């Protein structure tokens, strides 16, 4: 029984990870007006009857449901494996059915997620840039250059006035536009090290 329980547990673990991916896709695609809207998912069915223009994340929602079912199958396998006595377990039919069913539906869900969603994801570059520019977290990248206190003060002002951090830094003359662009570039902020600083510095 131990091998089947381990196999079923591995499916559950995969389902947890896959479910997280599906939930992240749902979150990142929320829109069109409210929500993050950082990505657009392929439309696989007509949109909402109460919200024209909305594309429902139908495939990620389906994947979440499959992952819940796989978790349930694993719970059944574990309970049935525990129900045996000594070297005999008459629960093998329900153990086998749930392990095979979980494997089958999880495999199909991954195929559908890839072919009907992942392969067609489009980044909303303008929206991503807008959210990055409005985020006060970019002040963290400025700290090595203007100091923590000044960066924190700028972040607070940006939140209070709903203005981009970049505009406030330029207005105060703390850094020139070229240097600021280098520090606040997406590439610089998503690489290891201090944004805008060369590796030999």
What are these regions (language model features)?
Residues 1-201:
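Conserved, well-structured ligand/cofactor-binding cores
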